[in-house]
Regions:
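Phosphate-backbone binding interfaces of nucleic-acid-interacting proteins
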Residues: 1-201
Protein backbone atom coordinates (compact mmCIF):
# COMPACT_ATOMS: atom_id res chain seq x y z
CA UNK A 1 0.00 0.00 0.00
CA UNK A 2 1.38 3.39 -1.01
CA UNK A 3 1.71 5.84 1.91
CA UNK A 4 3.42 8.81 0.26
CA UNK A 5 1.51 10.32 -2.66
CA UNK A 6 0.03 13.58 -3.90
CA UNK A 7 -3.16 13.99 -5.94
CA UNK A 8 -3.70 16.62 -8.62
CA UNK A 9 -6.80 17.28 -10.70
CA UNK A 10 -7.34 19.96 -13.34
CA UNK A 11 -9.58 19.70 -16.36
CA UNK A 12 -7.57 22.50 -17.96
CA UNK A 13 -4.32 20.55 -17.68
CA UNK A 14 -5.20 16.86 -17.82
CA UNK A 15 -8.71 16.79 -19.36
CA UNK A 16 -10.71 14.52 -17.05
CA UNK A 17 -7.66 12.76 -15.66
CA UNK A 18 -6.55 12.47 -12.04
CA UNK A 19 -2.80 12.67 -11.51
CA UNK A 20 -1.29 10.69 -8.61
CA UNK A 21 2.37 11.44 -7.96
CA UNK A 22 3.91 8.46 -6.15
CA UNK A 23 7.51 9.42 -5.49
CA UNK A 24 8.78 12.59 -3.91
CA UNK A 25 11.97 12.74 -5.97
CA UNK A 26 10.93 14.30 -9.26
CA UNK A 27 12.19 12.28 -12.22
CA UNK A 28 11.44 12.08 -15.93
CA UNK A 29 9.64 8.92 -17.02
CA UNK A 30 11.44 6.34 -19.13
CA UNK A 31 8.49 3.98 -19.69
CA UNK A 32 4.69 4.15 -19.92
CA UNK A 33 2.17 1.32 -19.57
CA UNK A 34 -1.62 1.26 -19.73
CA UNK A 35 -3.94 -0.73 -17.46
CA UNK A 36 -7.54 -0.07 -18.54
CA UNK A 37 -8.17 3.61 -17.66
CA UNK A 38 -4.91 3.91 -15.72
CA UNK A 39 -1.73 5.14 -17.38
CA UNK A 40 1.38 4.38 -15.32
CA UNK A 41 4.65 6.26 -15.76
CA UNK A 42 7.82 4.45 -14.70
CA UNK A 43 11.39 5.40 -13.97
CA UNK A 44 14.03 2.69 -13.51
CA UNK A 45 11.28 0.07 -13.26
CA UNK A 46 9.42 1.88 -10.45
CA UNK A 47 6.02 3.53 -10.83
CA UNK A 48 6.30 7.29 -10.32
CA UNK A 49 2.88 8.47 -11.54
CA UNK A 50 -0.60 7.02 -11.93
CA UNK A 51 -2.91 8.89 -14.28
CA UNK A 52 -6.54 7.78 -14.06
CA UNK A 53 -8.20 8.85 -17.30
CA UNK A 54 -11.95 9.44 -17.67
CA UNK A 55 -12.22 9.94 -13.90
CA UNK A 56 -15.73 11.43 -14.32
CA UNK A 57 -16.95 7.90 -15.16
CA UNK A 58 -16.24 6.97 -11.56
CA UNK A 59 -16.66 10.13 -9.49
CA UNK A 60 -17.04 13.89 -9.76
CA UNK A 61 -14.15 16.03 -8.53
CA UNK A 62 -15.23 19.61 -7.93
CA UNK A 63 -11.92 21.19 -7.02
CA UNK A 64 -9.05 22.22 -9.27
CA UNK A 65 -5.44 21.77 -8.17
CA UNK A 66 -3.65 19.70 -5.54
CA UNK A 67 -5.78 17.61 -3.20
CA UNK A 68 -3.71 17.56 -0.02
CA UNK A 69 -6.23 15.75 2.19
CA UNK A 70 -8.41 13.49 0.02
CA UNK A 71 -11.57 12.08 1.57
CA UNK A 72 -11.82 8.38 2.37
CA UNK A 73 -14.62 8.15 -0.21
CA UNK A 74 -12.32 9.46 -2.96
CA UNK A 75 -9.51 7.08 -1.94
CA UNK A 76 -11.99 4.17 -1.96
CA UNK A 77 -13.01 5.07 -5.53
CA UNK A 78 -9.38 5.38 -6.62
CA UNK A 79 -8.42 2.09 -4.97
CA UNK A 80 -11.30 0.28 -6.65
CA UNK A 81 -9.95 1.47 -10.02
CA UNK A 82 -6.38 0.50 -9.09
CA UNK A 83 -7.44 -2.96 -7.86
CA UNK A 84 -9.27 -3.62 -11.14
CA UNK A 85 -6.09 -2.61 -12.97
CA UNK A 86 -3.95 -4.89 -10.78
CA UNK A 87 -2.00 -1.98 -9.30
CA UNK A 88 -0.85 -1.09 -5.80
CA UNK A 89 -3.43 0.89 -3.82
CA UNK A 90 -3.24 4.09 -1.76
CA UNK A 91 -3.40 4.39 2.03
CA UNK A 92 -5.84 6.82 3.64
CA UNK A 93 -4.27 10.13 4.63
CA UNK A 94 -4.71 10.98 8.30
CA UNK A 95 -3.53 14.55 7.80
CA UNK A 96 -2.31 16.88 5.08
CA UNK A 97 0.85 18.07 6.83
CA UNK A 98 -0.48 21.66 6.74
CA UNK A 99 -0.83 22.61 10.41
CA UNK A 100 -2.39 25.62 12.13
CA UNK A 101 0.06 27.17 14.58
CA UNK A 102 0.17 30.21 16.84
CA UNK A 103 3.14 32.58 16.84
CA UNK A 104 4.41 32.86 20.41
CA UNK A 105 7.69 34.73 19.84
CA UNK A 106 9.32 36.88 17.18
CA UNK A 107 13.00 37.82 17.07
CA UNK A 108 14.84 39.95 14.48
CA UNK A 109 17.33 37.59 12.84
CA UNK A 110 19.73 38.31 9.99
CA UNK A 111 17.68 40.30 7.44
CA UNK A 112 14.29 39.00 8.60
CA UNK A 113 12.57 37.46 11.59
CA UNK A 114 12.80 34.18 13.46
CA UNK A 115 9.46 32.91 14.76
CA UNK A 116 8.57 30.40 17.45
CA UNK A 117 5.30 28.70 16.59
CA UNK A 118 3.16 26.64 18.94
CA UNK A 119 1.64 23.55 17.28
CA UNK A 120 -0.02 22.39 20.53
CA UNK A 121 2.27 19.47 21.29
CA UNK A 122 5.52 20.96 20.03
CA UNK A 123 7.28 24.25 19.23
CA UNK A 124 8.76 24.81 15.77
CA UNK A 125 10.84 27.60 14.25
CA UNK A 126 10.30 29.37 10.93
CA UNK A 127 12.14 32.21 9.22
CA UNK A 128 10.87 34.87 6.84
CA UNK A 129 11.53 38.51 5.97
CA UNK A 130 7.82 39.18 6.53
CA UNK A 131 6.86 40.73 9.87
CA UNK A 132 3.92 38.94 11.52
CA UNK A 133 2.43 39.83 14.90
CA UNK A 134 2.79 37.57 17.92
CA UNK A 135 -0.41 35.60 18.74
CA UNK A 136 -1.44 35.42 15.07
CA UNK A 137 -2.48 31.99 13.82
CA UNK A 138 -0.68 30.83 10.69
CA UNK A 139 -0.36 27.75 8.49
CA UNK A 140 2.96 25.91 8.40
CA UNK A 141 4.38 22.68 7.07
CA UNK A 142 7.10 20.56 8.63
CA UNK A 143 9.80 18.31 7.23
CA UNK A 144 8.67 15.96 4.48
CA UNK A 145 5.42 17.71 3.54
CA UNK A 146 4.98 18.25 -0.21
CA UNK A 147 3.81 21.50 -1.77
CA UNK A 148 3.72 19.92 -5.21
CA UNK A 149 5.41 17.09 -7.08
CA UNK A 150 8.73 18.96 -7.19
CA UNK A 151 8.81 20.88 -3.90
CA UNK A 152 8.79 19.63 -0.33
CA UNK A 153 10.14 21.11 2.87
CA UNK A 154 13.29 19.88 4.61
CA UNK A 155 14.67 21.20 7.89
CA UNK A 156 17.77 23.33 7.51
CA UNK A 157 20.34 25.22 9.54
CA UNK A 158 20.32 29.01 9.20
CA UNK A 159 23.59 30.23 10.67
CA UNK A 160 23.29 28.09 13.78
CA UNK A 161 19.50 28.17 14.09
CA UNK A 162 17.49 25.09 13.17
CA UNK A 163 14.54 25.95 10.90
CA UNK A 164 11.96 23.17 11.11
CA UNK A 165 8.83 24.81 9.69
CA UNK A 166 7.81 26.83 6.64
CA UNK A 167 5.07 29.49 6.42
CA UNK A 168 2.41 28.70 3.79
CA UNK A 169 1.24 31.55 1.57
CA UNK A 170 -1.74 31.91 -0.75
CA UNK A 171 0.73 31.67 -3.63
CA UNK A 172 1.92 28.26 -2.38
CA UNK A 173 -1.67 26.99 -2.60
CA UNK A 174 -2.36 28.74 -5.95
CA UNK A 175 -5.13 30.77 -4.29
CA UNK A 176 -3.61 34.06 -5.43
CA UNK A 177 -0.22 35.60 -6.25
CA UNK A 178 0.06 36.94 -2.68
CA UNK A 179 3.36 35.63 -1.33
CA UNK A 180 2.59 36.34 2.34
CA UNK A 181 1.86 33.96 5.18
CA UNK A 182 -1.78 32.90 5.45
CA UNK A 183 -3.30 34.35 8.63
CA UNK A 184 -6.19 32.39 10.13
CA UNK A 185 -8.78 34.93 11.29
CA UNK A 186 -11.61 32.59 12.28
CA UNK A 187 -11.57 30.35 15.33
CA UNK A 188 -9.31 27.37 14.79
CA UNK A 189 -7.56 24.99 17.15
CA UNK A 190 -3.79 25.22 17.34
CA UNK A 191 -2.30 21.99 16.03
CA UNK A 192 -5.30 21.16 13.84
CA UNK A 193 -5.10 20.32 10.14
CA UNK A 194 -5.72 23.31 7.87
CA UNK A 195 -7.45 21.25 5.19
CA UNK A 196 -9.62 19.44 7.71
CA UNK A 197 -10.72 22.88 8.90
CA UNK A 198 -11.54 23.87 5.31
CA UNK A 199 -13.50 20.65 4.80
CA UNK A 200 -15.53 21.18 8.00
CA UNK A 201 -16.67 24.71 7.09
Amino acid sequence: MIQDYLLYFSNNVYKDSLYIHLRRDYKIKDETRFFNDVEVLYRDGKAIVYMIHNISRYTKIWMDGYIYLPSKILIDVINSILINAGLETLAYKKNSGFVIGKIIAKTPYLTGFLYEIDLKDRIVHAYTDEEISVNKKVVVIEEGTSLDEKRYFLNYDLEGQKIDAYFISEKDLSISDLNKAIIIEQQADVGSDFFYLEEKR
